[in-house]
C-alpha cells in the first residue's frame, strides 16, 4: 500500500494493524528510519523486521525499544551510556548527503542569468569582465572580509563583487558606498544558488567561519573557491580542509588577494583549479563506496540475526542475496 493510503487512515488501531501487516506481507529484512515519530516507535516495538536500525544522520543519538543498531558516522563520538550496537560509516560531515548541483543544467541557469543578472553587470563602467563574490547568510560577512574584497576590486578594475543571501546586508551596502565602490558591487537578498551560483568566476569564501554548503555547491559547478585560514579558528577549520583546494587556502590577506587575482588573469591556472574544484565535489558526493560498505555491514548483521533466530521472523529460507531484500 502507498504512503498516501496509510495517511488517509484515521483510526489509530486500524492504521497500526495495516502497517504491521504490510511489513509482514512484504517480508522486509531490514528497516531503517531517521525520524523516530510515534508510528516508528510503535512499529519498532512490535518488531516488523529481523534488523531494525535508527540512522542518526549525524545529529542525535536516539535509543528506543526495538532498535538493534544505530547507524552513525565514524567521526561521531557517542557517549558510553549508549547501549545499542553501532554500524558506522565514513563521512566528511552531514553535508555529504545534500545534492550539491541542483536541478538546473548550466545552460538553463545561464539562460536565466541572461535575463536577471548579466544585463546589470554589463551596465557597469568599465563593463564587468569577472564576477567574484559569495552567497550565504549576511551575518558571516564582516568588515575585514569587505576590505579584502575592496583591494581586489581596486587591483582588477573589470571585476565586480556579487553577494546574495538572507539577512541584513546594510553593512556591505554602507561599506562600499563609503569607499566609493558601490558601482562595482551587486547585492541581493536570498535567491536560488543553483541559478545565481553560476554567475561567479571565483567564489571568495567568508571568514572567520567558512561558508560550508555554498562553497561545495559552487565547487560542484567547477568554480574555484579561495579561503582564508584564520589563525584563531584553525582548529575549528582543520576538519574541513579536505573539502577545499589546499593551494587556494590563504594564510594572509595579501595571499588571499593574490590567489583571487591569479585565478582571474591566468586562464591555464584557472582551468586547473576548475578541475580541482569538481574533483573535490565528486569526492564529497560520490557515496557509492561508503554506501556499499554500510550495506555489507547491514547484510552481515542480518545474517547473524537470521542464524541466531533460525527462522528470520518466521521465514526459514537462507539468505543468498548481495543486498537485503528491502531497505525502508
Placement of each model-derived feature along the sequence:
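Catalytic binding pocket for nucleotide-activated donors in carbohydrate/polymer assembly enzymes
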Residues: 65, 79-82, 201-202, 206-285
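C-terminal amphipathic helix plus adjacent low-complexity
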Residues: 259-328
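Structural motif
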Residues: 29-30, 131, 202
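Short acidic-hydrophobic, aromatic-tinged amphipathic segments that line or gate anion-handling sites
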Residues: 2-12, 187-189, 247-255, 262
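Conserved active-site histidine-acidic residue motif and adjacent donor-binding/catalytic loop
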Residues: 10-16, 167-169, 182-197, 210-211
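Active-site-proximal region of nucleotide-activated glycan assembly enzymes
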Residues: 47-112
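Conserved catalytic-core segment of nucleotide-activated headgroup transferases in glycan assembly
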Residues: 88-179, 183-191
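Active-site and donor-binding regions of nucleotide-sugar-utilizing enzymes
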Residues: 1-64
Amino acid at each position: 500500500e502507498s504512503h498516501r493510503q496509510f495517511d488517509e487512515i484515521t483510526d489509530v488501531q486500524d492504521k497500526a494493524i495495516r502497517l504491521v501487516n504490510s511489513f509482514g506481507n512484504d517480508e522486509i529484512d531490514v528497516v531503517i528510519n531517521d525520524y523516530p515519530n510515534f508510528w516508528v516507535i510503535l512499529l519498532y516495538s512490535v518488531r516488523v523486521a529481523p534488523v531494525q536500525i535508527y540512522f542518526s544522520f549525524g545529529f542525535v543519538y536516539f535509543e528506543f525499544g526495538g532498535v538493534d543498531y544505530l547507524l552513525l558516522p565514524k567521526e561521531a563520538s557517542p557517549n558510553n551510556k549508549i547501549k545499542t550496537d553501532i554500524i558506522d560509516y565514513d563521512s566528511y560531515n552531514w553535508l555529504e548527503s545534500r545534492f550539491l548541483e541542483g536541478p538546473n543544467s548550466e545552460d538553463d541557469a545561464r539562460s536565466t542569468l541572461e535575463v536577471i543578472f548579466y544585463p546589470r553587470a554589463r551596465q557597469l563602467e568599465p563593463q564587468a569582465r569577472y564576477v567574484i563574490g559569495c552567497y550565504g547568510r549576511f551575518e558571516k560577512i564582516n568588515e575585514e572580509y569587505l576590505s579584502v574584497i575592496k583591494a581586489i576590486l581596486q587591483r582588477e578594475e573589470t571585476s565586480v563583487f556579487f553577494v546574495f543571501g538572507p539577512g541584513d546586508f546594510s553593512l556591505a551596502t554602507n561599506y562600499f558606498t563609503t569607499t566609493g565602490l558601490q558601482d562595482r558591487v551587486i547585492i541581493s537578498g536570498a535567491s536560488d544558488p543553483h541559478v545565481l551560483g553560476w554567475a561567479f568566476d571565483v567564489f571568495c569564501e567568508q571568514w572567520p567561519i567558512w561558508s560550508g554548503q555554498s562553497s561545495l555547491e559552487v565547487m560542484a559547478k567547477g568554480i574555484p573557491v579561495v579561503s582564508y585560514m584564520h589563525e584563531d579558528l584553525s582548529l575549528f577549520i582543520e576538519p574541513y580542509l579536505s573539502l577545499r583546494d589546499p593551494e587556494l587556502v590563504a594564510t594572509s590577506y595579501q595571499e588571499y588577494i593574490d590567489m583571487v587575482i591569479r585565478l582571474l588573469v591566468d586562464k591555464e591556472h584557472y582551468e586547473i583549479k576548475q578541475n580541482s574544484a569538481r574533483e573535490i565535489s565528486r569526492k564529497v558526493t560520490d557515496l557509492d563506496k561508503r554506501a556499499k560498505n554500510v550495506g555489507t555491514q547491514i547484510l552481515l548483521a542480518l545474517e547473524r540475526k537470521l542464524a541466531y533466530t533460525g527462522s528470520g521472523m518466521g521465514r526459514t529460507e537462507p539468505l543468498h542475496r548481495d543486498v537485503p531484500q528491502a531497505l525502508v
